[in-house]
Every structure is written in structure tokens, then in C-alpha cells.
Amino acid sequence: MSTIGSPTGNPGHSSPQAFFTDLVIYLSVMFLVREVYFSEIGFIANGLMWSLTTLAVATWRMRARGVSWKDLGLRRPTNYKVALIATVFILGLAPVLVVLFSVMSDQLALVVAPDNSAERAVSRFGDLRGNWLLFLTIIPFIWLESMLEELLDRGVLINWIERMLSNKLFATIFAVIAQAAIFGFRHSHDLSERSITVGLIGLAMGIGYVAFGRNLWPLIAAHCALNTLSMLDRVN
């Protein structure tokens, strides 16, 4: 099991400046590609196009640094019990963080923009209410997107930020927080209830990643489960 302060892989003699350059390229593509939208193919297909484009850039920079997806955690768990615990931990921590934020925002009278994602759901996914055929048609693509987000937001971002900051414990803490903020902002380009909620889910994923051996499969399982529950709620 990797320690919290030790990113996996062998980056060779690459300098922190090299990883900084990689991050500039990577994040630029991650955000700018979302400006390209083909209305003819719908939101899900566009989302996959964005993620696959970012995946291609990530793979390119990983090869330049001598790092593989297996190094970042896309490998069979060495201990399935730990993997299961990690999945349950994430599924438990994510709602706890969201509830804690809700309580704190009420106590501190914080004002953020409301979550309007439900209003956009029909235009993005179609009318799912009572439509099990539509649900079964799109859920495999939702799972694929969930997997891609874990590779890109946890696997790449956490490890690259750590290496940019020379792999100190502070670097890991900062990386987990930074990727969560980026994850939230990428889903809603504002300081809103949705961006904060998604960011807190990303924080739970990041904590689970570094605390349980840096294997991506528990995160992928948890992410798929959360998105499945969200889609089921729209069906019912």
C-alpha cells in the first residue's frame, strides 16, 4: 500500500517544473475542450468526447514522464477487503461532507447560488421519469464517464500536483483539496450549491484514494454507485 505522501509510479528525472508544464497543458485542454459542443449528438456523447480528449492528453504526458495508468491505480486490488472498505468509506464520507456543509452554511448564513441541475436534466439525459428503457440505454455511458473522471481527476491530478510540489505530505493534502475544487468547478462554472456539492464528493474520492492504497477501482465503483442512484432518482 502506498503511503499518503508517496505518489505511485516512476517519474524518472522529471523536474517539478516539467510536471507544472504538464498540468498547464492538461488543465487547459480539460477546460477548453468543453467549449466545443455538437448539439446533434447530445450531452452524454459530448461529455465522453471531452473526457476522451483529455484522456489522450493525459496519456501523452504520462508517457513523457514514464508513468502508466497501472502506476496511478488502474490495477487489480491487492486486497479486495481493503478495496471494499474503501468503497464503503467513500460512499459514507461523501454524504457526510455534504450534510456538514449544509449545516455550516445554515449556521453561518452563507449565500450560494442554488443547484439548478435538476432543471437541466431533461435536456441532458432525456425525460427519465418512468422510462426504464432510456435509463438502461444511457447508464453504461454514465458508468464509462464516471470511470474516466476518476482516471482524470483523481489519478492524474493528484499525482501530478504532488510531483509538481516535490511529493511532500503538504503536497498530498494540497493535491486532494485542489483536485476537489477543480472537479466541482468543472461541473458548474460558479460558486454554487452544485459546484460545492460535487467538490465535496471529489474531496471524499481524493481522501479515499490516498488513504486506501491509491487504487482507482474503489473510487470508480463508488462513483458509478452515486451516479446510478442519482439517475434512479430521476426515473422514480
Task: Please annotate each region the language model reported.
Residues 1-14:
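Short, Lys/Arg-rich, polar N-terminal cytosolic tail immediately upstream
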Residues 11-20, 40-44, 48, 75-87, ...:
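Hydrophobic, aromatic-rich alpha-helical transmembrane segments
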Residues 16-67:
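Alpha-helical transmembrane segments in multi-pass membrane proteins
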Residues 30, 55, 62-66, 97, ...:
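Alpha-helical transmembrane segments of polytopic integral membrane proteins
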Residues 36-38, 57-67, 86, 207-215, ...:
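Juxtamembrane membrane-interface segments at transmembrane alpha-helix termini
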Residues 69-145, 163-166:
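Juxtamembrane helix-loop-helix connectors linking adjacent transmembrane helices
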Residues 130-236:
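Transmembrane helix-loop-helix hairpins at the membrane interface
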